[in-house]
Amino acid sequence: ADSHNHNDTGSVTLYKNGHPILVDIGVETYTQKTFSPRRYEIWTMQSGYHNLPAICGTDQKDGEEYRAGNVVTELTGTEPSISMELSAAYPDAGAIVPGLTYSRKVTLKKPSNTVVLEDHTNAQDVILNFITYEKPVFLSDGKLSIGEASASFEEADLLAIETLPITDARLKTAWDHDLYRIRLKMSGTDFQFTIK
């Protein structure tokens, strides 16, 4: 195991006006386990606690071969974006869904300061996780308020908004209160999450 790696390939962080919206939790206080083959038993290292999907009930694996492919960035113009294929990071899901595909594209639409995250897959069982600094408030079908941001999602159902207690001393230096996890179940094979 890489002693500083997290299973977070394709995860996204987002700030609005200097305030955290979608976050990376970080790492807890270092212990012997952190630098052992058991490091991925630590919740903050797992893809389920990053802004990523669980595909067919499985998370990303650790190892150099479990990485994004076909990474394309477009950084000019009014809609800079990054896209990538994430299926290689989910070998257990690939064993369940032969020929698994899972692509993610994130676009910043500059004129409206809107971020659009689009996921496409051939898997039928996908739960999306989004870690937030502020407690999300479910407003109506497909609409959330997250601190200063408004969010909407398409082709998914809200499963839960969970509280992630921040009790570790090192994490408390980064976060002054608990964090939250939004869990959405994709209802099809295409998903869109828009944040303004």
Model-predicted segments: where are they?
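Conserved nucleotide-binding/hydrolysis modules and their immediate coupling elements
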Residues: D8, N17, T31, R38-Y40
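CBM-like, beta-strand-rich accessory domains located in the C-terminal region of large
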Residues: K33-S36, Y40-K196
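Cytochrome P450 core scaffold surrounding the K-helix E-X-X-R motif
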Residues: S3, L22-I25, T29-T34
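An acidic- and aromatic-residue-enriched active-site/binding cleft used to recognize and process polar
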Residues: N17-H19, G26-E28, T58
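Carbohydrate-active enzyme catalytic cores, enriched for enzymes
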Residues: A1-L22, T76-G77, S83, A174, ...
